[in-house]
Amino acid sequence: MKKKVLSIFLVMTLVLTMLTGCGGGKEASPEEAANPNKLTVWAWDKAFNIYAMEEAAKIYQADHPEFELEIAEVGWNDVQTKLGTIVGSGNYDQLPDICLMQDFAYQKYVITYPDLFLDITDSGVDFSQFAAGKVSASVVDGKNYGVPFDNGTAIAAYRTDILEQAGYTIEDLTDIDWNRFIEIGKDVYAKTGYSLMSTQAASSDLIYQMLQSAGVSTWNEDGSVFFTDNEVLKQCVEIYKEMADAKVMQIVNSWDEYIATFTSGKACGTLNGCWIMASIQTATDSAGNWAITNYPSLPGVAGATNYTNQGGSTWAVTSNCKNVDLAIDFLNSTFAGSSELYDTILPGAGALATWLPASESEVYAEPQEFYGGQQVYTLLSDYSSKVPAVNLGVYYTEANAALYTLLANVVAGADIDAELQTAKETVEFKMQ
């Protein structure tokens, strides 16, 4: 009898223990459960994109104090690698809620991997309030796949104190062509030991900037590769080679080295998208000794201008977003709806808005002491309105890679025509 009572007692104890474990105990800790007020983001460039996203979070938190934002710094090359790995494995759980995408590559990702990003056409974002040319970078088959962010209008920025040592002013580098640029660059180098600009080896961005300044594409209207018989492209490569040989332009390997050339090294200028101003402004010891102007034009080319574009990016909501409504409301309330945000990140990072209402702010007309009192944002707004349109193509990334291989070979002494033919064949193979 005692054994029977003991058995019943043990069974009851076991049942009570199981009940406690299954539902009678405490609930999962907040750390164990998904945070409904948190978004994760992938972005690159601490001084620009990440800074802008952090400022957007502060503004959103004013009305949503429970909101949290976790930003992972992921370089653009790493973003591409990660996306490729995720698509290959089918494990979309590794995606963040929001991912920054380069404009020149975004359409290809949407077309090639339709399950990666969300269609936000009917999300409530007013896309008519963005520059039409900017919006088009994230539109596929009439549907919107992102919230536009920065303007990539190109600038030429120079150290005026170094130019002065060689006998030049910013006006001497305004409205000039590449022939005059090289002439001045040789003189500046001879007198000061400073190159007029620098570039990164594994990049053909400079070539694309030159081409767009004249409205010339690397693609024919039927989508085929336009490398050979493209006399303007050949001219751009010749200019690149001449500048490298004459030490008018430094060529370095990494992005960090590129930034260092003009913030602490021996380049007294840089030509890039206006977003580069965020990196220029990290050189606080040279504050007041910088000025910006427009871009050199291609000599002898019909339709050539002193205006071009480089880059620009878009915020995309991924298919793995845990809280789509929160992500949309956050982006709509900040990058698509806050003048305060753009008033902050414009002087803070040189983030020129493509959200049109932001340009009405008085901040745009304020003199910037870092640039010697220039009204730089008024200049940028003017430049952006004069940039020629150009077709970058769905296979921009493949063309870009082929061209920077070409540039390395040409600088080393290879024949330009032969390299253009090889690059054309390389891109055509990758398009198959």
Where are the regions a protein language model picked out?
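Extracytoplasmic "Venus flytrap"/periplasmic binding protein-like
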Residues: 59-130, 165-167, 266-269, 283-284
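Short, well-ordered beta-strand elements
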Residues: 34-46, 67-72, 97-98, 145
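Hinge/lid segment of periplasmic solute-binding proteins
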Residues: 99-155, 179-184, 190, 209-211, ...
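C-terminal lobe and pocket-closing loops
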Residues: 107, 276-286, 299-401
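Helix-loop-helix "hinge/cap" segment bordering the ligand-binding cleft or interdomain interface
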Residues: 62, 66, 138-206, 217-254, ...
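Extracytoplasmic ligand-binding clamshell segments of periplasmic binding protein
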Residues: 77-81, 215-289, 293-298, 325, ...
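Short, solvent-exposed loop/beta-turn-alpha elements that line the ligand-binding surface or hinge
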Residues: 118-130, 173-175, 196-197, 216-235, ...
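Short, low-complexity disordered leader/linker segments with a strong preference
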Residues: 1-40, 62, 418-421, 425-432
